[in-house]
Amino acid sequence: MVRRRHDGRGSDDRPTVRGGARVNIALVLLGGMLGAPVRYLIDRAVTARIDSPLPLGTLTVNIVGSAVLGGLIGASANGWLLTAAGTGFCGALTTFSTFGYETIRLVTDGAYGYALGNVVISVAASVGAVYAAVSLTNWVTP
């Protein structure tokens, strides 16, 4: 059973936006409505331009989304911005499920090296993008 807290924080100790759950849901929806089509457009643009056995469209959106989230965290974005842009936009832009599916598809196609490469590159590049963006925004912002 999850207990409700009344101190302005969510059940996982993250600050919530003033106005409660309805405002948070609206912010996530707004961010998601922007992130999902951006994901689709980036994926299609990359896939149309580069022919590769690696799923470079998914890799690109995951790296970009990780960098955006890292920038928000590094800049100490406020609650509403982190909810809309971090959870909503970046959540819709990035895609772990497609990453998993495409990796399994590579395995079932017998492309084991590409599958391993996809996992290593995706994780390393996404974590690296977060780290770089946090570092950059910490350096740029006082």
UniProtKB/Swiss-Prot annotation:
Its annotated compartments are: Cell membrane
The family database entries (Pfam families) matched by this protein are listed as: CRCB (PF02537)
What activity regulation does UniProt give? Answer: Na(+) is not transported, but it plays an essential structural role and its presence is essential for fluoride channel function.
UniProt topology in membrane: Multi-pass membrane protein
User: Transmembrane stretches, by residue range?
Assistant: 23-43, 54-74, 79-99, 116-136
GO biological process, alphabetically ordered: cellular detoxification of fluoride
Catalysed reaction equations from the record? fluoride(in) = fluoride(out)
UniProt similarity note? Belongs to the fluoride channel Fluc/FEX (TC 1.A.43) family.
Q: What is this protein called?
A: Fluoride-specific ion channel FluC 1
